[in-house]
């Protein structure tokens, strides 16, 4: 749908003469305050101690951050505008089954707190991909880094453009004005202020996100008769879903899909994603990092609850006040904005507050992307090749990288404007890549016999499967003549006397189930991470064992999950040998506090480097203990 965007007081679309609600001056002021305050916070941290900044302070906030700001930043990083718009639309169209996603948050945050954080924190890393070099080799590290850069570069442009497009279509808010304003402001405070500025602006933006959604819930519930009436209307029309225990992984949303498939999605975000790992490592202690992960749990539940309540309030509102034909045909990501403009049109400033809430989600996501991309580029791709960089030049280069990625983001936003139907494919790339990266880290932490070749082949296979299923699913849906109807009884193409329960009953008999490759492509998106990470682990293990496992290689004990030695000690000796856990019938020393160091050439130094240097007479201190693993094959 083409939208005319001008300076006139009202806007119309090319396919309808209906006047679109517009922003008042007060709304623009409220939205502008978000940008100004975010910029002020960033510039404050940039100017504070100017001239005394270090690379560690710029990229890692000097590793002195407290639990609460890190927790709110962790929440804000992936609480994007897409989630703020998509969650309520999901509830409005398909019912409350989506709410069970909250069940996945417990394990999805408990596992990172007690498995990934201890390993990463005790290795004293800056980039999560440094772990891959310590565990495998430099080639695996570069593969992981390049994969992450591709994932984030594609996503951040779409994450900036998509909400701006939805806002423009509904309110007439100038598309490229919002894109440029957000991109430039985010670019400035991220490049100059570093991670500390990003974290503290995330705190501010999280509060704005909660406030904006809370206002919509309160005002909307008041207009339709209270939350009790909202729930009664939703229940009357079958919108309140029971627990769907169908184990079929090809059903889009069931309890098992949401509660367990969602765990793997959470692990790919909160376990191994550089943006989140960087925040854990910026904490002043390992305990603070773990507590910040705990603190995200109630915050995530509140965010999910508010998102779902907005969907229910929206449903009750449009049962009382009818939709216009344009709204009935609107894209799902526009429904919430139409609702907000209808609900708050007589309250100047409140539409601006919700838009500030919406773009707070975008700012937090994009700034995290800029900062994490600058960090991995500096640590994984530049530092090893230019080891003689002075502190001053390293700081300038780090800031330049963040600024450069900001320009790339604006460029990707422009590219996104020409993608058309491929836009959904670009958004899906973020989810496709997360699963294989999760599998790569799990392969290293839990399987001592995995070798570098197995890791690389496993990652490439996982990525191939991810793109095959993901893109195949998108193409299949686009080419399908009959799409599943939304389950809300108010859509223009459903009879008014049908409810969610009625449609749900009719669907099995009216819609044929896909077969063959079509069924394969219909795998629920929440199982993507589980499927792709499992593929990486399975293929990685098979290739590793076929190629001799860790034949004659030393294994840095700090790269293995600390509890794993105790668990493997319970296995028979023959199993321990096959898993590379015993060498020459002797116990292998377990050391979990082994810290990597940076050598003069910018590369990582661990116990293997120290051994070689000791043999060459370059160092005289004792070598740190390592695993020497035996030959292993099938």
From Swiss-Prot:
It comes from the Eukaryota. It catalyses: biotin(out) + 2 Na(+)(out) = biotin(in) + 2 Na(+)(in); (R)-pantothenate(out) + 2 Na(+)(out) = (R)-pantothenate(in) + 2 Na(+)(in); (R)-lipoate(out) + 2 Na(+)(out) = (R)-lipoate(in) + 2 Na(+)(in); iodide(out) + 2 Na(+)(out) = iodide(in) + 2 Na(+)(in). It is found in: Cell membrane; Apical cell membrane. Glycans are attached at residues 488, 497. Keywords: Biotin, Cell membrane, Glycoprotein, Ion transport, Membrane, Sodium, Sodium transport, Symport, Transmembrane, Transmembrane helix, Transport. GO terms for biological process: biotin import across plasma membrane; biotin metabolic process; biotin transport; iodide transmembrane transport; pantothenate transmembrane transport; sodium ion transport; transport across blood-brain barrier. GO terms for cellular component: apical plasma membrane; basal plasma membrane; basolateral plasma membrane; brush border membrane; plasma membrane. The keyword Heme does not apply. Expressed in the jejunum (at protein level). Expressed in lung, skeletal muscle, heart, brain, kidney, intestine, liver, and placenta. It is a multi-pass membrane protein. Pfam families: SSF. GO terms for molecular function: amide transmembrane transporter activity; biotin transmembrane transporter activity; iodide transmembrane transporter activity; monocarboxylate:sodium symporter activity; pantothenate transmembrane transporter activity; pantothenate:sodium symporter activity; sodium-dependent multivitamin transmembrane transporter activity; sulfur compound transmembrane transporter activity. InterPro entries: Na/Glc_symporter_sf, Na/solute_symporter, Na/solute_symporter_CS, Sodium:Solute_Symporter_SSF. The chain crosses the membrane at residues 23-43, 65-85, 100-120, 142-162, 175-195, 207-227, 255-275, 295-315, 350-370, 403-423, 427-447, 455-475, 526-546. Belongs to the sodium:solute symporter (SSF) (TC 2.A.21) family. Interacts with PDZD11. Sodium-dependent multivitamin transporter that mediates the electrogenic transport of pantothenate, biotin, lipoate and iodide. Functions as a Na(+)-coupled substrate symporter where the stoichiometry of Na(+):substrate is 2:1, creating an electrochemical Na(+) gradient used as driving force for substrate uptake. Required for biotin and pantothenate uptake in the intestine across the brush border membrane. Plays a role in the maintenance of intestinal mucosa integrity, by providing the gut mucosa with biotin. The C-terminal tail is important for biotin uptake as well as apical localization in polarized cells. This is Sodium-dependent multivitamin transporter. It comes from Rattus norvegicus (Rat).
């Amino acid at each position: 749908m083409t939208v005319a965007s001008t300076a006139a007081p009202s806007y119309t679309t090319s396919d309808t003469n209906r006047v679109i609600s517009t922003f008042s001056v007060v709304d623009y002021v409220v939205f502008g305050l978000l940008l100004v305050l975010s910029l002020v916070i960033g510039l404050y941290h940039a100017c504070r101690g100017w001239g005394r900044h270090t690379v560690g302070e710029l990229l890692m906030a000097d590793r002195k951050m407290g639990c609460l700001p890190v927790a709110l930043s962790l929440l804000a990083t992936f609480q994007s505008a897409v989630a703020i718009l998509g969650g309520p639309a999901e509830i409005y169209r398909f019912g409350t089954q989506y709410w069970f996603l909250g069940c996945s948050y417990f394990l999805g945050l408990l596992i990172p707190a007690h498995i990934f954080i201890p390993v990463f924190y005790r290795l004293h890393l800056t980039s999560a991909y440094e772990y891959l070099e310590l565990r495998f080799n430099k080639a695996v590290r570069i593969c992981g880094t390049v994969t992450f850069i591709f994932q984030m570069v594609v996503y951040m442009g779409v994450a900036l453009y998509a909400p701006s497009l939805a806002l423009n279509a509904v309110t007439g808010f100038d598309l490229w004005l919002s894109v440029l304003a957000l991109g430039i402001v985010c670019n400035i405070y991220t490049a100059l202020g570093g991670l500390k500025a990003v974290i503290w602006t995330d705190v501010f933006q999280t509060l704005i996100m909660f406030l904006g959604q809370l206002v919509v819930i309160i005002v909307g519930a008041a207009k339709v008769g209270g939350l009790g009436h909202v729930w009664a209307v939703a229940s009357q029309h079958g919108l309140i879903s029971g627990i769907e225990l169908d184990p079929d992984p090809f059903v889009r949303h069931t309890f098992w899909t949401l509660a367990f498939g969602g765990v793997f999605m959470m692990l790919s975000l909160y376990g191994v994603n550089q943006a989140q790992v960087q925040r854990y490592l910026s904490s002043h202690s390992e305990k603070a990092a773990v507590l910040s992960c705990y603190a995200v749990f109630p915050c995530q539940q509140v965010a999910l609850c508010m998102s779902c309540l907005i969907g229910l309030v929206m449903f009750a509102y449009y049962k009382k006040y009818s939709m216009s034909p344009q709204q009935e045909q609107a894209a799902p990501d526009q429904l919430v904005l139409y609702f907000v403009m209808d609900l708050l049109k007589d309250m100047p400033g409140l539409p601006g507050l919700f838009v500030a809430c919406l773009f707070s989600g975008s700012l937090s996501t994009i700034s995290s992307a800029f900062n994490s991309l600058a960090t991995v580029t500096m640590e994984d791709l530049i530092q090893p090749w230019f080891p003689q960089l002075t502190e001053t030049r390293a700081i300038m280069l780090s800031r330049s990288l963040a600024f450069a990625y900001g320009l790339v983001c604006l460029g990707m936003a422009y590219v996104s404007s020409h993608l058309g139907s491929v836009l959904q494919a670009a958004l899906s790339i973020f989810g496709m890549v997360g699963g294989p990266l999760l599998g790569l880290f799990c392969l290293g932490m839990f399987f001592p016999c995995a070798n570098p070749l197995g890791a690389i082949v496993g990652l490439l296979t996982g990525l191939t499967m991810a793109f095959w299923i993901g893109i195949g699913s998108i193409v299949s849906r686009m080419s399908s003549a009959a799409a599943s109807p939304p389950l809300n009884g108010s859509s223009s193409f459903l009879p008014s006397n049908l409810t969610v329960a009625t449609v749900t009953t009719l669907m099995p008999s009216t819609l044929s189930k896909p077969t063959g490759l079509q069924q394969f492509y219909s795998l629920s998106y929440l199982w993507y991470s589980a499927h792709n990470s499992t593929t990486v682990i399975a293929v990685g293990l098979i290739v590793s064992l076929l190629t001799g496992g860790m034949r004659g290689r030393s294994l840095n004990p700090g790269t293995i999950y600390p509890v794993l030695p105790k668990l493997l000690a319970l296995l028979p000796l023959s199993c321990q040998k096959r898993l590379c856990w015993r060498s020459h019938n002797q116990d292998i020393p377990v050391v979990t506090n082994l810290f990597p160091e940076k050598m003069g050439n910018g590369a990582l130094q661990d116990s293997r480097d120290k051994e070689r240097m000791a043999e060459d007479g370059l160092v005289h201190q004792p070598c740190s203990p390592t695993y020497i693993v035996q030959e292993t094959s099938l």
